[in-house]
Amino acid sequence: MKTFPVSIVTPDGPVYEKEVEMVSVKAESGEMGILPGHIPTVAPLKISAVRLKNGGHTDYVAVSGGFIEVRPDKVTVLATSAEEANHIDTHRANEAKRRAEQRLQDKQAHVDFKRAELALKRAINRLDVSNMK
């Protein structure tokens, strides 16, 4: 099957750069599957896993928002943060989850609940993706 280059980039630099047959992402508008020759598109991403298929193998990358830019010959994900499944520190992710849950349970006025909810979603996503290795 035909392949195309995919780059997943964060403000800290590239996280993933390979040729793949298909990319699946969760955009704000819904799930997107991208094959070679896809029409040009730009879409905001949810906190989720990016699935990258090549042959019988699938790579998973946890992304925390950002955008996907699709061109007929290349796909670029510009993510706020991103980690490949095999690089996720599950101990750190569990600690972040615990802290976010604690902040959400505190009924104090100074707690930013939206920020705590996003931290919880990011931690859960990282843990889910780490199990997809």
Swiss-Prot record:
Keyword field: ATP synthesis, Cell membrane, CF(1), Hydrogen ion transport, Ion transport, Membrane, Transport
Listed InterPro entries: ATP_F1_dsu/esu_C_sf, ATP_synth_F1_dsu/esu, ATP_synth_F1_dsu/esu_N, ATP_synth_F1_esu_C, ATPsynth_dsu/esu_N
Superkingdom assignment: Bacteria
Pfam families in alphabetical order: ATP-synt_DE, ATP-synt_DE_N
Topology class, membrane: Peripheral membrane protein
One GO CC term, this protein: plasma membrane
GO MF term set: ATP binding; proton-transporting ATP synthase activity, rotational mechanism
Cellular localization per UniProt: Cell membrane
Family: Belongs to the ATPase epsilon chain family.
HAMAP family the UniProt entry points to: ATP_synth_epsil_bac (MF_00530)
Function of the molecule: Produces ATP from ADP in the presence of a proton gradient across the membrane.
Subunit structure: F-type ATPases have 2 components, CF(1) - the catalytic core - and CF(0) - the membrane proton channel. CF(1) has five subunits: alpha(3), beta(3), gamma(1), delta(1), epsilon(1). CF(0) has three main subunits: a, b and c.
NCBIfam families from the UniProt entry: ATP_synt_epsi, PRK00571.1-3, PRK13446.1
Name of this protein: ATP synthase epsilon chain
Native organism: Bacillus cytotoxicus (strain DSM 22905 / CIP 110041 / 391-98 / NVH 391-98)
Classification of source organism: Bacteria, Bacillati, Bacillota, Bacilli, Bacillales
